[in-house]
């Protein structure tokens, strides 16, 4: 059987690969018949600014994160123009806090505050009625809520009103430090609870739960140091980074179920004279881990220390790269690219940082949290 030869249209010149090496201008060439030399200018601009169609370049650059977008803009003037045109700055998170001038936490009256537009949305959550509620952690627009009476742990999404209950936490678990890796609607969600064991806290108890499981799984690990109590924890690069009250750092790997105490000395933020008057937080930005506080009391200027895992050291950032940190007990979110006056600033969960109020929220610090609004946030 004869096969028909298939023909293809000629490839457009703009899609063909050419050498990106700059060719030196040739001052002269020799003619084929050995005649006199003739001057000829030879210029090759390469692929960067001419060989990639604009719409394709914009599509590629629009898929990059902010840091990668900035790096790509350094290639040439054309890439700079297109990178800036599609650059996506991270939006400010929203603050969730009790509405004190009404019933407040006693009646389940809460507020969602959008700092970008100075808008407040008044909401009522019967499941948050009472004072014995703690917002243990916040991530991807979800809250992990702990109620002391009755003894309940559940997820709550203030933007949609969704609620997901978890199994009862095992006995002898204090639930003082709970956190999770991703939204409970994600298959990668993992919830962990830390409880120090024994009189001198030489052993740490880690309880884990994943969506679909009916019970918690309990692990016991040697803390290797006495007197360590975990009070800050974030999830980054597939690991839970756990910070103790004395500034010691440990890592829990949920996939391997391992616990390691890192040989990293506490940073300067954990000096006694700083900790007595200023809160210390831990946050994450594009895979980097930071310990942050303010430079002075009643001052929002950011003091940041970046974790260097290769050198096992916290490096103080003299200029914190224009980052803005929104801090609360439940979570601390980091943003880049905000207006100049908001860079290198640490905002607390006190509404007075944004608008003047006769009912500051610091009275309910464990009932307030910063939240990342969903992309399809049509209800607000």
UniProtKB/Swiss-Prot annotation:
Q: Which InterPro entries match?
A: F-box-like_dom_sf, F-box_dom, Gal_Oxase/kelch_b-propeller, KIB1-4_b-propeller
Q: Which UniProt keywords apply?
A: Kelch repeat, Repeat
What highest taxon heads this organism's lineage?
Eukaryota
Does the record bear Repeat in its keywords? Answer: yes
Q: Which Gene3D superfamilies match?
A: 1.20.1280.50
Q: Where are the Kelch repeats?
A: 190-233, 234-279
List the SUPFAM superfamilies hit by this protein, alphabetically.
F-box domain, Galactose oxidase, central domain
- Protein name listed in UniProt: F-box/kelch-repeat protein At3g18720
Task: Mention any Pfam family matching this sequence.
Answer: Beta-prop_KIB1-4
Residues in domain F-box? 47-94
């Amino acid at each position: 059987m004869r096969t028909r030869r298939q023909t293809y249209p000629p490839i457009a010149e703009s899609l063909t690969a050419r050498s990106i090496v700059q060719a030196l201008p040739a001052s002269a060439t020799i003619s084929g018949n050995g005649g006199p030399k003739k001057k000829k200018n030879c210029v090759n601009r390469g692929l960067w600014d001419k060989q990639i169609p604009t719409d394709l370049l914009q599509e590629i650059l629009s898929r990059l994160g902010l840091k990668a977008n900035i790096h790509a803009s350094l290639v040439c003037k054309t890439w700079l123009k297109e990178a800036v045109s599609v650059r996506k700055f991270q939006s400010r998170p929203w603050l969730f806090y009790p509405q004190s001038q009404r019933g407040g936490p006693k009646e389940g009256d809460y507020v969602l505050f959008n700092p970008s537009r100075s808008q407040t949305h008044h909401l009522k959550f019967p499941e948050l009625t009472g004072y014995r509620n703690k917002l243990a952690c916040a991530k991807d627009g979800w809250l992990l809520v702990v109620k002391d009476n009755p003894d309940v742990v559940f997820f709550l999404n203030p933007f949609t009103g969704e609620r997901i209950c978890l199994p009862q936490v095992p006995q002898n678990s204090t639930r003082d430090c709970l956190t999770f890796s991703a939204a409970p609607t994600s298959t990668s969600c993992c919830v962990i609870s830390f409880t120090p064991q024994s009189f001198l806290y030489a052993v740490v108890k880690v309880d884990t739960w994943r969506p679909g499981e009916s019970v918690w799984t309990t692990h016991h690990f040697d803390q290797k140091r006495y007197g360590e109590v975990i009070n800050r924890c974030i999830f980054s690069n597939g690991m839970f980074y756990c910070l103790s009250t004395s500034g010691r750092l440990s890592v829990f790997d949920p996939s391997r179920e391992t616990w390691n105490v890192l040989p990293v000395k506490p940073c300067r933020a954990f000096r006694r004279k700083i900790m007595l008057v200023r809160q210390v937080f831990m946050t994450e930005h594009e895979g980097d881990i930071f310990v942050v506080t303010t430079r002075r009391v009643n001052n929002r200027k950011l003091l940041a220390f970046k974790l260097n895992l290769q050198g096992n050291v916290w490096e103080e950032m003299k200029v914190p790269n224009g980052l803005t940190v929104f801090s609360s007990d439940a979570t601390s979110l980091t943003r880049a690219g905000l207006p100049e006056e908001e860079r290198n600033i640490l905002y607390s969960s006190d509404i007075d940082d944004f608008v003047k109020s006769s009912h500051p929220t610091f009275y309910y610090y464990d009932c307030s949290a910063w939240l990342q609004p969903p992309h399809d946030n049509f209800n607000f």
